[in-house]
């Protein structure tokens, strides 16, 4: 048994990885900020100790896993090196772990977490599959056949991975504090493609992904019969979305997803493709798909009277558009109200116009102050720069949440990657409802 200490254990990936190592019989603890982060619930439920940062946390028998947001000058990392302990970065550690399994990486600018959650759930319907999801959920199953994991492109960390398969959901410009432009992002994905050992499954409508060159087969999925795998004859009902799947132009089977929105059907197609390539039992796969309940902070619903309160991680314009589309399709007779907290000043600056455009798809938009990150906590613009670009946009905070009560028959989307949950929590407390977080 190894004793692991995670520096920054509340990070989404770090939390997931800590849970996996705990499940596999290791002693696990970690440190982080005192502020509440939604990932800590799963850690505490697993009995994993969370400590405040302190050099004295580091003991001579530990392996130290260093979160990517923390520099080598961090007091705990310095202490670990002084004790001559093994110190390994998150992405390097994960890269070693996946080599023990048939591994499936899920990468892309958007949709990684939702797709990884679906993939792990569906594959576990037929084969033992350990998984690491970017919503802070991880599970290590002894003697697993497969390992499904989220692979982030930020700072090219995913180049540490050499998976058997890679699902590439899309390529888009994001993380403007690191990537220069979309061509820089494409180059990172092109490098990643050469790391894949068996096959790549990629969205066929993405013009950048269509240019990917690889040493393994690339299977494109989508809604066109020009794709290798495509969905047709979509039917939406209260049960979800039913659709036929075709492989290389030939009918394969009919599936039912409990989810709504084109992006969720695309995610399902990528997972079905993996299942097909690995010859998994299709009846088990269909049954598992029908029981998927979603992942944390991805269109998580709480119904209060005729209001539907949705907690969602959307923090990029394309993700916001997809979340609003899902709300429109699932609740076509309700107004859609957006409550959005921009995440990082650099992203807000880079996509100011796009944020205004996508948020204008809602019937009404409320905006919170910009949430900085550990790396960047201030900038030259303010939330007013976005407010001025959206007709009728209004500022909101924990003290003014009563403004949401007037939308008595609406879907209210609380969106953001920071601490937007505090706004939803304040609103639920205001109307006398217990918050789920």
Curated annotation (Swiss-Prot):
UniProt subcellular location: Cytoplasm
UniProt pathway annotation: Cell wall biogenesis; peptidoglycan biosynthesis
Classification via InterPro entries: Mur-like_cat_sf, Mur_ligase_C, Mur_ligase_C_dom_sf, Mur_ligase_cen, Mur_ligase_N, MurCDEF_pg_biosynth, UDP-N-AcMur_Ala_ligase_MurC
SUPFAM superfamilies: MurCD N-terminal domain, MurD-like peptide ligases, catalytic domain, MurD-like peptide ligases, peptide-binding domain
Annotated catalysed reactions: UDP-N-acetyl-alpha-D-muramate + L-alanine + ATP = UDP-N-acetyl-alpha-D-muramoyl-L-alanine + ADP + phosphate + H(+)
Documented EC number(s): 6.3.2.8
Positions of ATP binding: 108-114
Gene Ontology CC entries for this record: cytoplasm
Family: Belongs to the MurCDEF family.
Function: Cell wall formation.
PANTHER family named in the record: UDP-N-ACETYLMURAMATE--L-ALANINE LIGASE (PTHR43445:SF3), UDP-N-ACETYLMURAMATE--L-ALANINE LIGASE-RELATED (PTHR43445)
NCBIfam families registered for this protein in UniProt: murC (TIGR01082)
The protein's name in its UniProt record: UDP-N-acetylmuramate--L-alanine ligase
Organism: Staphylococcus saprophyticus subsp. saprophyticus (strain ATCC 15305 / DSM 20229 / NCIMB 8711 / NCTC 7292 / S-41)
UniProt gene name: murC
């Amino acid at each position: 048994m190894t004793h692991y200490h995670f520096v920054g254990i509340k990070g989404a990936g770090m939390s997931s990885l800590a849970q996996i190592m705990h499940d596999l019989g290791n002693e696990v603890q970690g440190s982080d900020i005192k502020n509440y982060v939604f990932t800590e619930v799963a850690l505490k439920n697993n009995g994993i100790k969370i400590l405040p940062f302190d050099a004295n946390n580091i003991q001579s028998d530990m392996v130290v896993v260093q979160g990517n947001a923390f520099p080598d000058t961090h007091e705990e990392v310095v202490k670990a090196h002084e004790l001559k302990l093994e110190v390994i970065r998150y992405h390097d550690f994960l890269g070693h772990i996946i080599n023990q399994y048939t591994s499936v990486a899920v990468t892309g600018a958007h949709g990684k977490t939702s797709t990884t959650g679906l993939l792990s759930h569906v594959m576990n319907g037929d084969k033992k599959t350990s998984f690491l999801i970017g919503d802070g959920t991880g599970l290590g199953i002894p003697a697993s056949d497969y390992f499904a994991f989220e692979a982030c492109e930020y700072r090219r960390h995913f180049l540490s991975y050499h998976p058997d398969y890679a699902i590439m959901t899309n390529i888009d410009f994001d993380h403007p504090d690191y990537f220069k432009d979309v061509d820089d992002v494409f180059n990172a994905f092109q490098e990643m493609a050469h790391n894949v050992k068996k096959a790549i499954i990629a969205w066929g409508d993405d013009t950048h992904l269509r240019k990917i060159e690889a040493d393994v087969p690339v299977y494109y999925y989508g809604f066109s019969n020009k794709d290798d795998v495509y969905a047709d004859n979509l039917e939406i009902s209260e049960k979800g979305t039913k659709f036929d799947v075709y492989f290389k132009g030939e009918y394969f089977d009919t599936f039912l997803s409990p989810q709504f929105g084109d992006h969720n059907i695309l995610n399902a197609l990528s997972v079905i493709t993996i299942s097909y390539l690995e010859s998994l039992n299709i009846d088990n796969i269909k049954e598992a798909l029908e029981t998927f309940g979603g992942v944390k902070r991805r269109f998580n619903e709480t119904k209060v009277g005729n209001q539907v309160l949705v907690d969602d991680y959307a923090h990029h314009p394309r993700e916001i558009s997809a979340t609003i589309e899902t709300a429109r399709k699932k609740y076509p007779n309700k107004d859609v109200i957006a409550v959005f907290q921009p995440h990082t000043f650099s992203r807000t600056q880079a996509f100011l116009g796009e944020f205004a455009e996508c948020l204008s798809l809602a019937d009404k938009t409320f905006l919170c102050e910009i949430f900085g990150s550990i790396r960047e906590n201030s900038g030259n613009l303010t939330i007013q720069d976005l407010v001025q670009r959206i007709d009728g946009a209004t500022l909101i905070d924990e003290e003014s949440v009563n403004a949401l009560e007037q939308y008595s028959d609406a879907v209210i989307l609380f969106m953001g990657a920071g601490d937007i949950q505090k706004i939803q929590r304040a609103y639920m407390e205001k109307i006398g409802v217990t918050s789920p977080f």
